[in-house]
Amino acid sequence: MTAGTGLTALNTLQLHASAERLVTVTSSDQLRAEIAALDEGAVPHVLGGGSNVILCDHLPGTTLLMAIKGREVLSDDDTKVVIRVGAGESWHDFVVWCHHQGFHGLANLALIPGSVGGAPIQNIGAYGVEVADCIEAVHAVHRQTGERACLSLKDCEFRYRDSVFKHEAGAKWIITEVDFVLDREAPVEANYPTLRARLSKAELTHDAVLAAVISIRRERLPDPVITPNVGSFFKNPVISQQDIDILRQNFPEVPVYPASNDAVKISAAWLIDQLGWRGEERDGVKVSDDHALVLEGCGARSAAAWLALAADIAASVEEAYDVSLELEPRVIGAAG
């Protein structure tokens, strides 16, 4: 346990936030003990890889740093494999390990920063795959009571970049382990346009997809170790077919992708780019020159500067297109 700890090294925006009390958690039993020791009514903050969060200047009370490790093969019938993974494991390292073991399904999600425990919260996705496609169950502990729970795929309520864990009903849970079901004989998933354009028919192998995904991400997204960022700062808006028909009357070239039955997903990057935001810099935060959906730090060390630029971008998109943008990273602490 460390009191008055700086969190700069624990978030990829490199924000100069601090925690009143920081505790590294390495087991679910320790987690439950820490929760039991909290003052009545106290709710801890939780940090994982810090790659999809915006930390406000000071986090009062207790902040738990999730460091539960471990990979355990629960079952293996030579086709399907079920693996239980600690929430504190590196996401990318886990993906690469699965690939080398011949456990397929996650290669398209390679090089996404963060931890295994953060993957279900956001329902991370890339290049035509979402992590929900490979999750069997999520194990968690109640933030206030220490109660254990195992949430099924249905319980998790996965949607585009969303899950029950981002809402009141699920935010009470702290994820400790995730059970994945992977497939030794899974077909290659290379239908996403960016990925398909990179690969020839002769290269439609799991090895080629993994290499291509890593290469594309390195080309398109800045390394957070060098340039503070959280990847995509906004979700791609999901709107009804009726709304896209109206939008296309004035903006026929807006990129559209399938989402669900009567909804489509539109490119937030395109909306932002068309309004001239690329390269714009304010108070130490800049819209990337290479990707309008990525905000980069160039001196800003507080959440306020990031949130202010994001709010201005969202307001301009709302005014121009009557489309609402949602932040992809979660804000932790009280923004002020």
Question: Where on the chain are the PLM-derived regions?
Answer:
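A common structural junction motif
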Residues: 40-43, 314-321
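Anion-binding (especially nucleotide phosphate/pyrophosphate-binding) glycine-rich loop
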Residues: 1-145
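His/Asp/Glu-rich mid-to-C-terminal helical/loop segments that flank catalytic regions of hydrolases
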Residues: 301-317
